[in-house]
Amino acid sequence: MDWKITIFTYNLAMKASDSEAVHNMLNGMIDDHTHLVAIGLQEVAHSETIGGAVLTWATTIASWMNTNGRMVLLAKTFQATNQVLIFGRKQLIGQIKRIDYRFQRNTMGGLTGHKGSIGVRLQLASPYSIVFVDSHFIHGPENYGKRVEQYHTNRNCSFPEDKSVRAAFWFGDFNFRVEEDVNTVIRKIKNGTHLELLDTREQLKRALVERDAFIGFHEQPVTFEPTYRVTVGTTEQDGKRVPSWTDRILYKGDGITGLSYTNNKKAVASDHLPVVAMFRVTAPAAPKPQWEVIFEHLPTWYTSIPLVGRFQVNELYYKENGSYRDWIGVFPSSINDCTTATNWIYAATCFEQVIEGSKFLACEFNNIPAGNYRLGYFSCHLHCLVGLSKVFQIVEQP
């Protein structure tokens, strides 16, 4: 099976989100046949992660992806001002058997994660995994050695010990710089000779060639202009920093083909330009999904009656991965976000029922408005849905 994977990295420079900025970032950048989309954001405003922001990049991106990309949110996490969002086709929900996270903090001696990395591993129904790592390393042209050191301390986020990893993608604002003066680089950009700097004066290329960092990782050919630092609202270099390709996307693994790699000059909300890459990953076909939790099909329900759903749990699942913090949620039939339900209860609050000699667990929900829904069982330890009902309808009672 071939998976098409699209990856974005965007340093937001603490700028507020709006629907136009998100549309400019994503529109035209995602192939209709893409299976997974990973988005790494750096320098997200603190108000978005600790509360206070009414509109956030994460919610606005998710809304756009649901409406325009026909994608559902599979995973989301953050560390300080860094965020990772993973989206996938709805039919892939059952192929994700486990999601794991790793974090590494580098700011203030490891006290905070403003600089650092987030690793996300998707374990598939086939015996393979896909890893995404989003990093924001220390700034400054003089800090090449510290960036290399941060790579080595952050390497654990790529799950290097896991032999099941079929493909690993490492992206973010690496902050590697061009070792040249500002005016020379700007002049080369204007006369179209800036790409020659990649082979002679660019720090990430040096790190790859000299094997100082990202050993075993590769990069598609860079054919775009430096992504930092531009004047907000334009694509013009502001001349206050040496123009550099700070924002990059690397890959490692068997059966990976790079399909495209570019910056996005339509997205000008920040002093960075976002970078987007598309890949094809060849992996063995996955077996038909086998849910750990099986829901009994629900008939049409009335809003005036508490919703009662029944399900059975695989005993081996609960023995190995079950938790009192597992929860059952009511999701819209579109399942825009696998991590957030419209209503939910802890599995520990469910009660047992015996129907015709078979044992079920039952969950109950009140005040569910009319609409089309599904019930889902979310595993606290596996960080994903391990059971999903068929669509059912709730209607107003005549």
UniProtKB/Swiss-Prot annotation:
SMART domains membership: IPPc
Record EC number: 3.1.3.-
Keywords in alphabetical order: Cytoplasm, Hydrolase
Family annotation (Pfam families): Exo_endo_phos2, SKICH
GO biological process assignments: fertilization; flagellated sperm motility; phosphatidylinositol dephosphorylation; phosphatidylinositol metabolic process; synaptic vesicle endocytosis
Subcellular locations according to the entry: Cytoplasm
Tissues and organs where the protein is expressed, per its UniProt entry: Expressed in tail, cilia, dendrites, axon and male head.
Source organism, top-level taxon: Eukaryota
Cellular component GO terms, alphabetical: axon; cytoplasm; dendrite; membrane; neuronal cell body; non-motile cilium; nucleus; presynapse
GO-annotated molecular function: inositol-1,4,5-trisphosphate 5-phosphatase activity; phosphatidylinositol phosphate phosphatase activity; phosphatidylinositol-4,5-bisphosphate 5-phosphatase activity
Phenotype when the gene is knocked out: Reduced mating efficiency. Defective sperm. Abnormal distribution of pkd-2.
Function: Dephosphorylates a number of phosphatidylinositols. Controls the cellular levels and subcellular distribution of phosphatidylinositol 3,5-bisphosphate and phosphatidylinositol 3,4,5-trisphosphate. Has a role in sperm activation and motility. Influences the localization of the transient receptor potential polycystin (TRPP) complex proteins lov-1 and pkd-2.
Entry's family note: Belongs to the inositol 1,4,5-trisphosphate 5-phosphatase type II family.
PANTHER family documented for this protein: INOSITOL 5-PHOSPHATASE, INOSITOL POLYPHOSPHATE 5-PHOSPHATASE
Protein's name in the database: Inositol polyphosphate 5-phosphatase
Taxonomic lineage from the root: Eukaryota, Metazoa, Ecdysozoa, Nematoda, Chromadorea
